[in-house]
UniProtKB/Swiss-Prot annotation:
Name used for this protein in its record: Tubulin alpha chain
Entry-annotated residues carrying N6-acetyllysine: K40
Source species: Daucus carota (Wild carrot)
Residues at the active site: E254
Key words, A-Z: Acetylation, Cytoplasm, Cytoskeleton, GTP-binding, Hydrolase, Magnesium, Metal-binding, Microtubule, Nucleotide-binding
E.C. no: 3.6.5.-
Amino acid sequence: MRECISVHIGQAGIQIGNACWELYCLEHGIQPNGQMPSDKTVGGGDDAFNTFFSETGAGKHVPRAIFVDLEPTVIDEVRTGTYRQLFHPEQLISGKEDAANNFARGHYTIGKEIVDLCLDRIRKLADNCTGLQGFLVFNAVGGGTGSGLGSLLLERLSVDYGKKSKLGFTVYPSPQISTSVVEPYNSVLSTHSLLEHTDVSVLLDNEAIYDICKRSLDIERPTYTNLNRLVSQVISSLTASLRFDGALNVDVTEFQTNLVPYPRIHFMLSSYAPVISAEKAYHEQLSVAEITNSAFEPSSMMAKCDPRHGKYMACCLMYRGDVVPKDVNAAVGTIKTKRTIQFVDWCPTGFKCGINYQAPTVVPGGDLAKVQRAVCMISNSTSVAEVFSRIDTKFDLMYSKRAFVHWYVGEGMEEGEFSEAREDLAALEKDYEEVGAESAEGDDEDEGEDY
């Protein structure tokens, strides 16, 4: 079995987690108490969904997940929410005082006390797996817990489970919307360890997802629930091939192989189509070609950066529902002929496609329409560097005055860590620049010979 363990860290990680597990349960027909009437093989069984759920002898399905936060309020919502019976109480770990938006508290002082407990619980989940494939880690890098404890856990997972893949779903600060003043510090410090300790990171950013909700779903004032439900569709599409039997299945390690040309260049953009409200879907025929095109629209990207400003290195298209390979090939062929979508010249094919016959499921009473087919795209584009350069600029403005730095130093960090992390990110921006311009230099030489 190829199990995946999900680790949800901090408020963002947990709330995205809630949306994901709600959706998984609906997709597999698992009730909020963990019972699954449709499952005939009680206690174990080699069903595809066992990658994400473990089964008890009593036929209860328990998510292979842990939720961690340094303060109790968000986890208490899980403990009292609709799905309270789904999780084992030991899977929900909360501390007493929060990280106060401070990376150093999450990473050094307070995080340090809780991290062993987390690893212990993860070890229990891992022992329960026959062939652990890897970890899905959900966090945000703007806050204190997601960035600090998130980095700490990733570092420790690398030590304990060196060869296992780690996929990160990471909420990055948005250009305009900010939830805390020290976001740039936390993000830079945290990206420093994401660079080293995740194999693939999918960047999400609230502002981009707000815009998608407003534009495509006509939600005047989107809430985090609206945002998270959209994100959960993306994550569900990515993991569908692990949870259902499909025609063209895609493994977690396959993402890595197909999307990451160089170890450091592993920050991905994601998009999902069709994002459409029930009123509209009734009147539209959404063909494979149409949803494929809209997945490539800059406005569909779930992070604020424009793929037209960069080049694609690789792309993963995960289709689900009523889709046949012939249509996919045609749609991809059309995309390749478009001049607006540029690939780097050293990666001619650039597409990895997966198809899953399970139609997309929607949360009842949610915003998305029930559709026959959907596509989720994860792409590696040099334009992601825009996200980093934005954060770096803000970091530099504050750090030049050493503003707020004493809060971090007071928790046992050294100033050197700031500059080290910042240099690492500067190097990353440079890496992206070079990858995009890889063989452009070759062209200049040819022109020289023409004279």
